Amino acid sequence: MIPTVKELLSSKLEGQAVTVKGWVRTKRQTKSAVFVEINDGSCMANIQCVFDQEKVAEPALAAEFEKTTTGASVSVEGVLIASPGSGQKLEVKANSLRVIGEAPAEAYPLQKKAHSLEFLREIAHLRPRTNTFGAVARVRNRMAFAVHQFFQERGFNYVHTPLITASDAEGAGAMFQVTTLDLARIAAGGAVDYDKDFFGKPAYLTVSGQLNVETYCQAMNRVYTFGPTFRAENSNTTRHLSEFWMIEPEIAFAELEDDIALAKDFILYLVKTALSDCADDLAFFDARIQPGLIDSLGKVAKGSFSRMTYTEAVAELLKHKGVFEFEPYWGCDLQSEHEKFLTEKVVGGPLVVTDYPREIKAFYMKQNDDGKTVAAMDVLVPRFGEIIGGSEREWRLDLLEKRISEVGLNKDSYKWYLDLRRFGSTPHAGFGLGFERLLLYVTGMTNIRDVIPFPRAPRQADF
């Protein structure tokens, strides 16, 4: 393989013949030279290829330059030399150029000008060629790798959980149904005979891999899943997607304190990795998207987490009545504005909130002795709010059966899950981190549809 632009710019190949392949970002000329900037997505930087005007005037090269427009894919050959300019250390003194794929200027939508993020969402198949979305893609790649690094280094096993399920892990009912039945006939007749459906019963796209990964936790101790999940919530907001990726570890013989320690270590690992390995891309986001981003991440990386119970958090919020759009009260689900206020105004840094009311949390969370709260925790960070949600799981069979009945779930659908409590049950805990929400936080992007390659949301399933 030929070297990438990133490899060339960091190489010791000065004075050697090189080949550059990529996409044209800009072409400009002076009386003595023509400058072509090429990017191949391997890094934020372009590599500058310089052609003498005399060379460009040669008929064969002149014909290629006619087709050399922004967006065209090209192959350039030349010698890597020290650059006299201030913008880069190295450039290519070029002697040949070949256009591989044309991008006619009158049709190519990504010309050399600023494009709104809204416009770029309409051309999601081309937006990776912009600086912003190239940077997002590289950070996404590095963070995904870091997720696996973190858990593999700590003895966790990676488990592939199913995308099609008959169980609702959250008990919320906002699930996409999977069927091979003729929907037109169902609409006409009204009744649904699931015996004739593919699985012989109602089946859905998973909202979480947690329940499934718990089965392996109860056999292999430390496990995690990292895959796509689906929610059929009609939420057209900057923080919701219908398809997104979730990271969900589970640890056996563990309680809430173990869960909190793991979550804190995980956040610190990811933030430090982003700062060290994505420096150029974060510098771009800091300059163009979220001023102060690097400083904000740096403060989190120092590792100081405050802690309070949900009850204490609500008490703090009630001291500031009139500040919030949604007034807090004990029993409310904390809103993003509450979480940001707690982290930015009350404690001035990351915060772990524990012991939430059981009525606003999932059925599988361990009930505390007070009968009102569960052994749950959320990790909140400044500028964003909740980034991780987790809990100790209810491992006592009688209490879990009772809770399933209380929330109106079909106990038969959870027989296999209850079996984990019937046979060799252990205290265990875990958490979930929405991968796209992590990326929003690390990049400073403000719309979750801009940190996933092809966003899926209500009325949006293009590409």
Please state what every model-predicted region is.
Residues 108-110, 140, 157-164, 218, ...:
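Short coil/turn segments at secondary-structure boundaries
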Residues 3-252:
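Class II aminoacyl-tRNA synthetase-like tRNA-binding/catalytic domains
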Residues 135-139, 255-262, 305, 392, ...:
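Catalytic cores of large soluble enzymes that bind and process phosphate-bearing ligands
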Residues 219-220, 255-276, 445:
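His/Asp/Glu-rich mid-to-C-terminal helical/loop segments that flank catalytic regions of hydrolases
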